[in-house]
Amino acid sequence: MDDTLRTCHPAVSFAYFALVIACAMLLMHPVCLVLSTLGGGWYVARLLGGKGLRRHLLWLLPMALLAAALNPAFVHQGVTILAYLPSGNPLTLESLLYGLAAGAMLSAVALWFVCVTDVITSDKVVYLFGRVIPALSLLLSMILRFVPRFVRRLRAVAQAQRHLGRDTQTGAPARRVRSALRVFSIVVTWSLESGLSTADSMRCRGYGLPGRTSFSLYRFDRRDGAVALWLAFCGLYLLGGGLAGGLRFQYYPMLLSGPVTPLTVSFFAVYGLLCFTPVLLDSLSRRRYLARKGGTPRA
């Protein structure tokens, strides 16, 4: 069964990612960071499989650890001194924990952007913004598909060059460098020519002209309306929680969090449901499909 959020209206999918990424960047409470990272990681595994998630974790984990290490090296605020650096500056617990929180935030945002590139395809970007900002929408659609297409072309060209005896992994170091540069030059030239051809093709078809109409298969149905209402509720509820201080967590000069009350727990619960909304949509779609299949009489 296909991912349910991918089959929703592009405006609904875009609104969900805009909301969840904004919350992932703004809410630095440890509970929110854990929920956002787990939700983004699960969705990446749902879209790309476990192998795809592991491939992204190979560079996300070092990035998070680097952020955690750099922050206490340059920021020395905090009242809990753990040790003193060779420079004489204090190493504080608060700066270390804030570095870990910043690394978790960057990892969560990166995971959600991986999901964006898989769900919000180039045709959806053109559909959403083609009439309002046609030039920018075309540029965004080309950017979204540039990296995956560049990687595929890089692999294809490298394989073709390998069959011609120009392998980038065997031979003398100088020869491998020349082969790698040749492969990179071919792929860059290919990508630039493709981008120019796409721009010329869209211009010849009248893209961006006033009054131009376009054909689309997207229809806003009742399911999209229900998801949009759910996103509006989550956004307003979390906004109220942020203004009320229920999602606030202070790192400097000392660790300080608001009191744990049923209201603050409800804020975290709503945020967790927001991060795992794709799970809920898939579960509801699966139950509806099984119920419909079970109620259909056999021939």
Question: Where does each model-flagged region fall?
Answer:
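Interfacial helix-loop-helix linkers and transmembrane-helix boundary segments
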Residues: V34, G49-L58
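Transmembrane alpha-helix interface motif
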Residues: D2-L48, A156-A299
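Juxtamembrane/interface alpha-helical elements of multi-pass membrane proteins
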Residues: H56-A174, L290-A299
